[in-house]
């Protein structure tokens, strides 16, 4: 969306909300006390007006991709871009006494070409003023930026913003909105991990994926001493517009976001993703194919967890597949889902740079009836940790047509543990490896004659110990092949049970094998459901090779 189109949209919103008239001296004084950087014209603002603005915008053609930036910004290297720092003396709420939160902005440049507009809102009068770009808001350090190219470019805007929380004001941020509609938050470890997005469009279709942009933000000024604030956002893309309201709670051990969105479709949409999240899984206990490093595991998230509308809890360990995989788990009014990082043991990662053991989980809790649809999971092959290869979102069953209006309410929890968990036994870990031999016997002098793949799933909690004397029964369902050598082993170190079985192929097919298992005692389920997708090797690879023999 170009600047002229945005201004027209802003004028439409002003018409809906009412003209500001002559601002009172009190209103001007309030803005001055909150921030010395809001310098635009004073206009009225409220969420209803933003919804009207987004709806009106959807009836007009999309403004297109962002225009070019000045050369000195467009050609920045990642190192140069990262050296540009916002001047904390010009933070948004620098003038608020006893502030517990503050806002700083990201500079446009490098790949961040969308010029995002920022507004400060007086919560008492509902009046807003724009914050225009000017070079003196930033410290350019060794970035090599020619600031003379930036003089007078007040419409340059910003790339995004980040939130700081006391006592780490201006030092360590806890929330970040940067690029398209991406945003992230941390728990009490201050370690970023996976990302969320405002919306996903056509992630897995025969066409090009579309990435909507947050093109403007309005910040309600946080109250003195408060760790909660509200920010509103306008979303825009070729297919849809949206009005968003984020109420962000920056708590001691987690960040919680209450999200309300109103979406307006410009055109038919093949696949709409609600509450999308993006993560990375390179290797873990269950997948060691590309993990030839000193790090035993490399991942931002280790599983997809789902609390289905019928009350069933599901654990689906993530994979780094050999080819792209897309799975849709059908549901009706889901209770929650998320990408979790539950393994918090440093020794399982041995990474003093990435600190994967400290990365947060992200849980989505619908706050309204979402109806029928699917929790969709896409896993993309990756050979390293720098590419996000896992995408998850809710896909409504109903097709989206041009002119449709939709609304969703949900809560996001950025925390070490999800806010709820199954009262039944839970999956702690999934391991895979060579099969076809008795447990306790390791290949040495000879290898098994018949190829098989072993799966070991560790369960903890619930009523496992009470159920053991009565008999624990693993209920295993496979889309192909056979499960043999099934064992139930008590493991004292984690005070739980390991269910182990070997998968034997019954054909030469290399199609993914869908596996499903839960534990039962006297006809009643006593565990959450474990789902897995295994990719069998080609028939000529289904043999063991003695590594001691040089070939």
Curated annotation (Swiss-Prot):
Keyword set includes Lipid metabolism: no
Pfam families: MdoG
Gene3D superfamilies: 2.70.98.10, Immunoglobulins
Compartments where located: Periplasm
Annotated GO CC locations: outer membrane-bounded periplasmic space
Pathway where it operates: Glycan metabolism; osmoregulated periplasmic glucan (OPG) biosynthesis
Protein name: Glucans biosynthesis protein D
Provenance organism: Salmonella enteritidis PT4 (strain P125109)
Gene that produces this protein: mdoD
